[in-house]
Amino acid sequence: MILQRLFRLSSAVQSAISVSWRRNIGITAVAFNKELDPVQKLFVDKIREYRTKRQTSGGPVDAGPEYQQDLDRELFKLKQMYGKADMNTFPNFTFEDPKFEVVEKPQS
């Protein structure tokens, strides 16, 4: 009886470990594969270049003054339509509980 439980437990642990190993081996195989094809290498290089541009500019990349003017114009329209609130924050709602009248039940 004890041996059967032990074998069941060991098989469950063994299957969990094997699944974990398969996942880890799959991840590390991709991480250690430094040989990229030329298209993949260009794609990764462009992503890195974009990230550095975005960090240095602190905003949209390759956006001219037209973009900033359009953004300001659209934010102004939204403020006009929905009030003078800050558009970058979620609105704060306040709800009041309704007041109910207490109605006496007629006795029959």
UniProtKB/Swiss-Prot annotation:
Record's subunit section: Component of the ATP synthase complex composed at least of ATP5F1A/subunit alpha, ATP5F1B/subunit beta, ATP5MC1/subunit c (homooctomer), MT-ATP6/subunit a, MT-ATP8/subunit 8, ATP5ME/subunit e, ATP5MF/subunit f, ATP5MG/subunit g, ATP5MK/subunit k, ATP5MJ/subunit j, ATP5F1C/subunit gamma, ATP5F1D/subunit delta, ATP5F1E/subunit epsilon, ATP5PF/subunit F6, ATP5PB/subunit b, ATP5PD/subunit d, ATP5PO/subunit OSCP.
Transmembrane segments annotated in the record for this chain: none
Protein name as annotated: ATP synthase peripheral stalk subunit F6, mitochondrial
Gene Ontology biological process terms from the UniProt entry: proton motive force-driven ATP synthesis
Homology family: Belongs to the eukaryotic ATPase subunit F6 family.
Keyword Disulfide bond in record: no
InterPro entries for the chain: ATP_synth_f6_mt (IPR008387), ATP_synth_f6_sf_mt (IPR036204)
Keywords from the named record: Acetylation, CF(0), Hydrogen ion transport, Ion transport, Membrane, Mitochondrion, Mitochondrion inner membrane, Phosphoprotein, Transit peptide, Transport
GO cellular component, one term: mitochondrial inner membrane
Highest classification ranks of the organism: Eukaryota, Metazoa, Chordata, Craniata, Vertebrata
Organism per entry: Bos taurus (Bovine)
Function: Subunit F6, of the mitochondrial membrane ATP synthase complex (F(1)F(0) ATP synthase or Complex V) that produces ATP from ADP in the presence of a proton gradient across the membrane which is generated by electron transport complexes of the respiratory chain. ATP synthase complex consist of a soluble F(1) head domain - the catalytic core - and a membrane F(1) domain - the membrane proton channel. These two domains are linked by a central stalk rotating inside the F(1) region and a stationary peripheral stalk.
Record localization: Mitochondrion; Mitochondrion inner membrane
